[in-house]
Amino acid sequence: MKHIFMNMAVVGLFSLGLASCSDELNISSIDPQSKTTYDDMELLAKQYATLGLTGQAGPAGKPDISADEGETGFYRTTFNLQELCSDECIWAWQNDNDIPALTNISWTAASDRVNWAYQRLAYDITLFNQYLSETETREGDDYKKYRAEVRFLRALHYWYFLDLFHKAPFKLVYNPEVLPEEKAGVDLYNWLDQELTEIEPELAEVGAFNNKANFGRADRGAAYALHARLALNSEVYTDGQKKEYQKAIDYCDKILVDNAGKYELCREAKNGYSGYQQVFMGDNDYNEQAMKEIIFPIRQDGKKTEAYAGSTYLISSMRVSGMPYAGTSEMWSCNFARKALATRFLDIENNNEANNLAKMLSETKEYKKAYEAYTNGKTFANAGAASDPTKMTEAEVIAADEALGGSTKNIIRIANDERALLYAGVGGGFRTLTTDQISGFTNGLSVVKWQNSRSDNSTPSDGKFSDTDIPLFRLAEIYLTRAEAKYRLNGTQDLEDINELRNRAHATPVSAVNLAVLLNEWGKEFYMEGRRRSDLVRFEKFAGNKYIWDFKGGVSKGTSVDKHFNVYPIPSKDTSNNPNMHQNPKY
């Protein structure tokens, strides 16, 4: 991110002069307010910076929220509430604060991680309200667009409130003396629908910011994408009062038909990286093919946006020392794939190669037996490597993975799908497909979808913090949204939209559409992108007993959980301090 807009974001961060609002958050309702003065365009950039930064002094030192700063960023908090409770991943270290509550779907109104997400959303909205209040009298077309962009960011945050909590502490003005009101369900849905409709014509035209100078700003494409997502979930958000699937289709068509060609799927392989891989790499803000797919990103730069809550979190938490092609010096060994995610790609019941790989991964002793048979008679650079893969060099690990079948390349081949970016190799230790007891990072396969390496093979800007922008909205979502909305509206078999994505991944095209096919496709295309819980709720597969996955409900083989867990509780800190906010049922 060597561009003007991101440089401004960093300057704007400090121009605000905000002290941390943490003390106020701890003692009063979650409505952080501080007196500030604005410095024009830099402050617009600051509004965007809230998506990727966590405070005013790099990764730590002057946090926005009073907690572990790396844990309380916008994307990390919302990602955790969407993914750690789902069928996709497990946090290896179950003794960490509040982690079991997410793993097992057993959170309460006192859960810290629920509170952190709630605080972050409320804090950011206050900044947006402040900007809008102080620029209300500014004139000119530029300010009209700037204000529309900030209104979009505010709407995005209220969407997260609706999706996660089914209600929000709602306020549209900057006034420290007034507590937020509660707006829930259909009322919040209707407000979002109206707000997006109002700001769409005031935003820059579709694709206007899909260039290196302005990448990361919201144009109409971003608003249309959010509007389509809102409408697709209308039945859930309004408790069945609305089913606006035609509206979802219409907003997809505004991108795919009315503005055809403004965005394109990243298809062409480059230096051995598939088109799909390139969307999640460290140069996805320079690689024009990857940029073309991304409708709205969270900007990240290893030098200019140091934080532990953005793509650095996604990359570092999913790697352990010893894994090949790491692309980072930060390897935290935290998030690994649940069996349900691995078998989404590896059909162990019907594919002999997948079944054979699963047998080797069934127990550590089985993998070790195969490993020692491979290393027998070979010479290695370091003593002990013949029995302990953590003592291998990277080149030796790569060779062993190719021979034993645990490489990502081999998993892609077996899955017949380039989206199967999983690693079952020996880098960092012997992995298993699943476990009866969560004890460490190698209890499952590793997810290598997110990476800081670059498709042009150039060096990342920093060895510790990631350059990889986070595609918050990308064109693939529009294809799948339209396909699902058509099916839910009248049973239309929209094979073309689904197969656009499968063809890009060189996967076998589908020949029929049903809800199971649609959910499976969402899972293969968007795993570990911070949305899985939402999709499972929409398909009635999250709470209840219609779908059971490993460690759901705190049991290794999984069990049913009560349906009140489909939404998160309002943090007790807020219900205690704001009489306008009421707790969700059964919390």
Mark where each language-model region is.
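Flexible, polar/acidic helix-loop-strand segments at domain edges
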Residues: 99-106, 116, 343-474
